[in-house]
Amino acid sequence: MTTHKAMTRVQLEAMGEVFAVDNLTRMGLRGLHCNWRCRYGECDVIASETAHRTVVSRLRSIAATVMEGSRRSAPEQKVRWLRWLAGLWPANQDEF
């Protein structure tokens, strides 16, 4: 009999970040930063396609049998907050 251990929340989040970075890389983006934190919050993955376009993401890895879509975990207020937080990132980078 085979028993399967459930992943911990930390393991699931780490797997989600690897999956996201792999997908962004396949789309032609290059990773700039993972798990960037400031006093106001955290961005999980920051990637760039060009010098003028940067993708900032806050990941939510959910273990479920049915996915209800990304809007379930990203209400408009959270999207606005992430956009604001993304604007803080370049000011905190020496090379950007």
From Swiss-Prot:
Pfam families annotated for this entry? UPF0102 (PF02021)
Identify the domain of life: Bacteria
Query: Per its record, what are the GO molecular function terms?
Result: nucleic acid binding
Q: Which residues form the signal peptide?
A: none
Q: Which residues form a coiled coil?
A: none
Family, as annotated: Belongs to the UPF0102 family.
Q: What is this protein called?
A: UPF0102 protein ML1607
* Source organism phylogeny: Bacteria, Bacillati, Actinomycetota, Actinomycetes, Mycobacteriales
